[in-house]
Amino acid sequence: ILHGGILGYMDEMTDFIDRLQKDYQVIAMATRGHGKSEIGSKPITYERRANDVLAVINAVTQDSVTVLGFSDGAYTAYKVASLFPERVKKMVAIGAGEQTPGLRTVNFNGPIFDPNNEIWTQKKKLMPEPDRLVQFWRDMEQFYNSMVADKALFMSIKCSTLVLSGELDRNAPLATVIEAYQMIPNSQLAIIPNTGHVTFMENFDAVWACIEPFLSVE
């Protein structure tokens, strides 16, 4: 399970973890710069994040896995499936569509991005290097504004994939999600009506009703 970026963390994925652990071994990891995971010293790339995920998988199992990712975590999931097809048997990607520079502009500004905001006071208690938080935001702005998730990536994904999104998602607009779905060879599409980016927090029952049968079919 791969959570969303910046404001995201494993606590947002609790409902998935609770449901999945009844039938599956669940591996939930915090990505670089989130929770107790270090930011690192090398430039941020989804290839690097995919290798992080593979390292965690290898530490737990040598079997192939199902990857469920949300937002930033879904883009990482796409890359894991592309680079390591033999290790990913299924994938659920939530809130992540086609992306090229210029389609959106990401800025981590405003009151919620005040380092003294209570949200960040709590998050910094977990961080190994809390003094790097603001620079991490600036680096992530640059990363998100230059990232590419295009036909070459999506057509390289061979595993069975469920592309899921909220109808009103402004981070990954509906048209971009449909484009991703159409480019992934073995994919299914689920759109949750009248929900936004964090669709599973608005209507988890509807999201789970799409995911559960997808996972249960061999």
Task: Label every model-predicted segment.
Residues 137-153:
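Active-site nucleophile elbow and catalytic-triad environment of alpha/beta-hydrolase enzymes
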Residues 194-218:
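Catalytic active-site module of serine/aspartate enzymes centered on a nucleophile-bearing elbow/loop
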Residues 168-172:
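Acidic catalytic loop of the alpha/beta-hydrolase fold
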Residues 47-65:
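Conserved acidic catalytic loop of the alpha/beta-hydrolase fold
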Residues 177, 181-198, 213:
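Catalytic histidine neighborhood in serine/cysteine hydrolases
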Residues 1-36:
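Conserved HGGG/HGGXW glycine-rich cap/lid loop of the alpha/beta-hydrolase fold
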Residues 75-83, 89-121:
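Flexible "cap/lid" loop of the alpha/beta hydrolase fold
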Residues 157, 163-165:
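Short beta-strand/loop motif that positions the catalytic acidic residue
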